[in-house]
């Protein structure tokens, strides 16, 4: 089973695909979609095209998306919600369903502490998947963490 984890962002959207087979999790691919244009419509199209390419290249059975973190800038939250809505629609179209998890849920599931720092989450991701190299930017480790949490929720791992 392949699980796609997504950490949506307004400039970088982290993604990771993990595999569950023979009672073991492994990382298939991870990276980020870099959003460079400044026009909202183009940003959304770039994001959706990149997600389409990812879904064309890899077979995905389950998708988990990190829920929006409500910051202090309402304009940023609205923009992020628009990106997330576009991602959700594309995932429903291509995969059929997705699950959502808050940052607090993901941090608690991986570290035991819902207020853990991103670096602590990255440490646990590396430990659980036996990754020896550094994971940068942290959007990538967040996406991997979302996928791992989803595997835990499905009682796969």
UniProtKB/Swiss-Prot annotation:
The Gene Ontology CC terms held by the record are: cytoplasm; Holliday junction resolvase complex
Cofactor mode of binding and number, as noted: Binds 2 Mg(2+) ion per subunit.
| Protein's recorded name | Crossover junction endodeoxyribonuclease RuvC
Look up the EC number in the record and give it: 3.1.21.10
Q: Which cofactor does it need?
A: Mg(2+)
Which GO molecular function entries does the Swiss-Prot or TrEMBL record give? crossover junction DNA endonuclease activity; DNA binding; magnesium ion binding
Catalytic positions?
Answer: 7, 66, 139
Catalysed reaction per UniProt? Endonucleolytic cleavage at a junction such as a reciprocal single-stranded crossover between two homologous DNA duplexes (Holliday junction)
**Family to which the UniProt record says this protein belongs:** Belongs to the RuvC family.
* Subcellular location per the Swiss-Prot or TrEMBL entry: Cytoplasm
Keyword line: Cytoplasm, DNA damage, DNA recombination, DNA repair, DNA-binding, Endonuclease, Hydrolase, Magnesium, Metal-binding, Nuclease
Q: Which Pfam families match?
A: RuvC
Quaternary context: Homodimer which binds Holliday junction (HJ) DNA. The HJ becomes 2-fold symmetrical on binding to RuvC with unstacked arms; it has a different conformation from HJ DNA in complex with RuvA. In the full resolvosome a probable DNA-RuvA(4)-RuvB(12)-RuvC(2) complex forms which resolves the HJ.
Source taxon at top rank = Bacteria
UniProt xrefs under InterPro entries? RNaseH-like_sf, RNaseH_sf, X-over_junc_endoDNase_Mg_BS, X-over_junc_endoDNase_RuvC
Query: Which positions are annotated as binding Mg(2+) 2?
Result: 66
Q: Which HAMAP family match?
A: RuvC (MF_00034)
| Group of enzyme by EC | hydrolase
């Amino acid at each position: 089973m392949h699980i796609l984890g997504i950490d949506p962002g307004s400039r970088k959207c982290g993604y990771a695909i993990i595999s569950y087979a023979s009672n073991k999790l492994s990382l298939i691919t991870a990276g980020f979609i870099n959003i460079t244009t400044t026009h909202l419509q183009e940003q959304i199209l770039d994001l959706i095209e990149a997600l389409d390419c990812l879904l064309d290249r890899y077979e995905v059975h389950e998708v988990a998306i990190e829920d929006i973190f409500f910051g202090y800038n309402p304009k940023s939250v609205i923009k992020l919600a628009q990106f997330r809505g576009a991602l959700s629609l594309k995932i429903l179209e291509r995969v059929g369903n997705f699950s959502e998890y808050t940052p607090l849920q993901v941090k608690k599931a991986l570290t035991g502490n819902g207020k853990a720092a991103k670096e602590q989450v990255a440490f646990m991701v590396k430990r659980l998947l036996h990754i020896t190299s550094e994971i940068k930017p942290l959007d990538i480790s967040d996406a991997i963490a979302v996928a791992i949490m989803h595997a835990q929720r499905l009682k796969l791992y």
